[in-house]
Amino acid sequence: MLITQIIMKQIRDYPIVSTISIAVSTVLASEVIWKLVQCSRSKREKASRVHEVIIFNELGEICAAVHMRNSSMGSQKPQVSPCCNTHCSLRNVAKIVEQIDRAVYSIDLAIYTFTSLFLADSIKRALQRGVIIRIISDGEMVYSKGSQISMLAQLGVPVRVPITTNLMHNKFCIIDGFERVEEIRLLRKLKFMRPCYSIVISGSVNWTALGLGGNWENCIITADDKLTATFQAEFQRMWRAFAKTEGSQIQLK
C-alpha cells in the first residue's frame, strides 16, 4: 500500500518524467516478452527440424511394381502408397522432394549427375514459387543422356561448371542457406521475411534412377547450422570460382 502511494505521488509531482518512465518500462517489458516468445519458438522449431540418414540399397526396388500399379498418370510427385518395405526407394526420394518443396528463398545444388524426373519436377515447382536456384555440375555430365540440367538452364536456372578436366563430383543441395537468404534479402531490399531454416542434403547418391533406386548409396538430410553453413560456404566459393562458365561454356543441346 505504501509503495503504491509513493508511486502515485511521483506521478503527480513529476507527470512528464513519470509518463516517459512508464512508456520506456512498457517497451522494455514488451521486448523481453517478445524475446522469450522467440526463444521458445526457436527451441520448438529446432526440436522439430529434420536430421535423417537415408540408405539406398538393392532392396529399394522390390516394391516398385506395387507403386507402379497404384500411381496416377502424369503425377509429378512420388506416389508413396502404403508400403511395408523399410528400404523403399520411392519413399526415400519422396523425403528429398519434401524438403525441396519446402524451399522458400533459395536452392543451391552441386551435383555430378542429375537425371531424376521426380527431383527435376520438384526443382521446377520451386522455380515457379519464386525460389532462386543455382546449379553447379560437371562440365561433361551436364550433357549426359537424360540430364535434367540443360532443361533447367533453358528455364532460366544459372548453371556453372569448373574450367578443368577434374571432376566436379559433389552431390549436395543447400535449401535456404542462411548466408544465401541474407544475400537475397539485401538484394531484393526485403523488410519482412517469411519463416524458413537451412537444410542440407548430401551423400554419395547422384540424382539418377540408378543412384536413387538400385545402387548402394547414402544420403543425409540435416538442419544442423554448422553443417549447412560449411556446405553453403563451399558452394559460394565454387560459384565465384566458376563465374566465367555461366552462359558461355554451357551450350544447350
UniProtKB/Swiss-Prot annotation:
EC number: 3.1.4.-
Any single Pfam family the record assigns to this protein: PLDc_2
Coiled-coil regions listed: none
GO terms under cellular component: cytoplasmic side of mitochondrial outer membrane; mitochondrion; P granule
Domain PLD phosphodiesterase: 164-211
Residue intervals annotated with topology Mitochondrial intermembrane: 1-13
Membrane topology: Single-pass membrane protein
Active-site residues annotated for this sequence: 169, 171, 176
Record field: transmembrane: 14-30
Cytoplasmic side: 31-253
Variant or mutagenesis effect after changing residue 47 to D: In zuc(RS49); produce some eggs with a more normal eggshell phenotype in addition to the ventralized eggs compared to null mutants
A single BP term in Gene Ontology: primary piRNA processing
Protein keywords: Differentiation, Hydrolase, Lipid degradation, Lipid metabolism, Meiosis, Membrane, Mitochondrion, Mitochondrion outer membrane, Oogenesis, Transmembrane, Transmembrane helix
Main subcellular location of this protein, as a coarse class: mitochondrion
PANTHER family registered for this protein in UniProt: CARDIOLIPIN HYDROLASE, MITOCHONDRIAL CARDIOLIPIN HYDROLASE
Assembly: Homodimer. Interacts with miga/CG12125.
Domain notes per entry: In contrast to other members of the phospholipase D family, contains only one PLD phosphodiesterase domain, suggesting that it has a single half-catalytic and requires homodimerization to form a complete active site.
Role: Cardiolipin hydrolase present at the mitochondrial outer membrane required for piRNA metabolic process. Acts by catalyzing the hydrolysis of cardiolipin (diphosphatidylglycerol) to form phosphatidate (phosphatidic acid or PA) at the mitochondrial outer membrane surface, promoting the piRNA metabolic process. Plays a key role in primary biogenesis of piRNAs and is required during oogenesis to repress transposable elements and prevent their mobilization.
Protein name as catalogued: Mitochondrial cardiolipin hydrolase
Species of origin: Drosophila melanogaster (Fruit fly)
Lineage: Eukaryota, Metazoa, Ecdysozoa, Arthropoda, Hexapoda
